Swiss-Prot record:
Membrane topology according to the record: Multi-pass membrane protein
GO cellular component, one term: plasma membrane
Pathway: Bacterial outer membrane biogenesis; enterobacterial common antigen biosynthesis
Complex and partners: Probably part of a complex composed of WzxE, WzyE and WzzE.
Signal peptide: none
Keyword Coiled coil part of the UniProt annotation: no
UniProt lineage: Bacteria, Pseudomonadati, Pseudomonadota, Gammaproteobacteria, Enterobacterales
Principal subcellular localisation of the protein: membrane
GO biological process, one term: enterobacterial common antigen biosynthetic process
Coiled-coil intervals: none
Annotated InterPro entries: WzyE
Swiss-Prot/TrEMBL keywords: Cell inner membrane, Cell membrane, Membrane, Transmembrane, Transmembrane helix
Protein name: Probable ECA polymerase
């Protein structure tokens, strides 16, 4: 890459970043937080944060990258995607009407809400315990990270249930919403994330998600300023780098440490070069249509229920890894959101996917606002827990693609909804047995309340 070519890419990168950052800043000033703000920051991180890191790798360490014209296509496709997404998100197809009273879809009381978070926590803890009994601490047993996907590890499907510890702790926080509950959420979820990191053998997702949710709650409540958020972001990047070194068993120093930091940070937070690789091999792609979305559900179907289930799931990530890159190392390489759309339908699917994503984020914001307006604090805690719990799925959307997002959000919805139903069933059984007693306020306290 020549200096002139880099200068052209830098101009496009600066304009694109300024365009998205400006819209995000105005939205942040308007509402402080919604899922449009979160997705916009996530989109910036995924598709634009890595450009400076790539530039240093190219000019400092002479690392090979895709041709400049392909990198330009990747930057422009990301900017155009966001433009279509933003217009879709902001467009109203009908006038906003004043909310009229309507019969709620469901209600929650104190006992049902506490039962819900206990069930969600139980799902996570039991899954971790069973996985540990089968495999022990994989971080200290396996020699390479790719081994966690091999036949040496049993009960891999249980990992999908670990994440429900975070929504459980979110319910606990939203029932109180004070600084102590906020700090308890951080300590409990990060401790659980570190435990699963050691048991699973290097999976950092639970730690990243817990820390991100903690920061966004702090921003919403005004407990964290923007400079504190920036400092926490730097701390998070360094922490994830250290965990990555432990995961891959790397011992580096000097220039090698700096080089390792650059490429691991880029691959962890901003795999934008994967989109460039896809575009570089565009002529080799056999467009998959909507099949990757259907195939991604295969992993949630147990073999005892479907004995003939394919052992290899050809979703967009695996298609990109195996068919496009011819990489059979055992690790799936993230195609990114835009990359998954290219795999499914080429360039035509990029604006269509942007419209779909705009509607998805709009729906989550509608649900979040519903929770903000809900007078029943127990129901509000459940709605907010569901919305913030889905942040993991939004990260999957940006990094892994639309197909992975759809299967995971459906799985999350089913498990979360089933936990609600079981909680309501248990409440009905306990109430029928006379075990539920309404809280009564003592007379002196009632008199004191009246005086106040």
């Amino acid at each position: 890459m020549s200096l002139m070519q880099f200068s052209g890419l830098l101009v496009v990168w600066l304009l694109s970043t300024l365009f998205i950052a400006t819209l995000t800043w105005f939205e942040f000033r308007r509402v402080r937080f919604n899922f449009n703000v979160f997705f916009s920051l996530l989109f910036l991180l995924t598709f634009f944060f890595g450009f400076p890191l790539t530039s240093v790798l190219v000019f400092r360490f002479d690392v090979g990258v895709a041709p400049p014209e392909i990198l330009l296509q990747a930057l422009l496709s990301a900017a155009c995607f966001y433009g279509v997404y933003y217009v879709t998100y902001k467009t109203r197809l009908r006038k906003r009407v004043v909310d009229v009273p309507r019969k709620p879809l469901f209600t929650m009381n104190r006992v049902e809400t506490h039962l819900t978070w206990v069930i969600l926590m139980g799902i996570a803890l039991v899954s971790v315990a069973i996985f540990f009994m089968h495999n022990g601490f994989l971080l200290f047993r396996l020699h390479s990270y790719s081994q966690i996907f091999s036949s040496e590890v049993s009960g891999v499907a249980l990992k999908r249930f670990f994440y429900f510890f975070i929504p459980a702790m979110l319910v606990v926080y939203f029932l109180r919403q004070d600084s102590k509950a906020w700090l308890f959420f951080l300590v409990s979820t990060v401790a659980f994330g570190l435990l699963t990191y050691m048991i699973v053998g290097g999976t950092r997702a639970n730690i990243i998600i817990a820390f991100a949710i903690f920061l966004f709650i702090g921003i919403i409540r005004g407990w964290i300023s923007l400079w504190m958020l920036a400092a926490a972001g730097v701390l998070g990047i360094v922490g994830m780098f250290w965990l990555a070194l432990k995961r891959y068993g790397l011992n580096v120093s000097g220039d090698e440490a700096f080089y390792t930091f650059l490429y691991l940070t880029r691959d962890t937070f901003s795999p934008w070069e994967n989109l460039a690789l896809l575009l570089q091999n565009y002529h080799n792609i056999d467009f998959q249509g909507l099949a990757p979305i259907v195939r991604d559900f295969y992993v949630f179907i147990p073999t005892w229920l479907w004995p003939g289930r394919p052992s290899i799931v050809l979703n967009s990530a695996n298609y990109f890894t195996w068919e496009v890159l011819n990489n059979h190392s055992g690790l799936a390489i993230s195609p990114t959101l835009i990359g998954s759309l290219v795999v499914m339908g080429g360039a035509l699917f990029i604006p269509l996917g942007a419209i779909v994503v705009g509607l998805i984020i709009k729906w989550f914001d509608w649900l979040y606002e519903l929770g903000n307006r809900e007078p029943n604090r127990y129901k509000a805690a459940i709605l907010h827990s569901f919305c913030f719990g889905a942040i993991f799925n939004m990260i999957v959307l940006a990094r892994e693609g639309l197909d992975s997002f759809v299967s995971r959000v459906v799985f999350f919805l089913v498990v979360f909804g089933a936990s609600l139903l079981v909680a309501k069933l248990l409440f009905w059984l306990f109430d029928s047995a006379g075990l539920i007693h309404k809280r009564t306020t003592s007379l002196p306290q009632a008199q004191m309340d009246g005086k106040l």
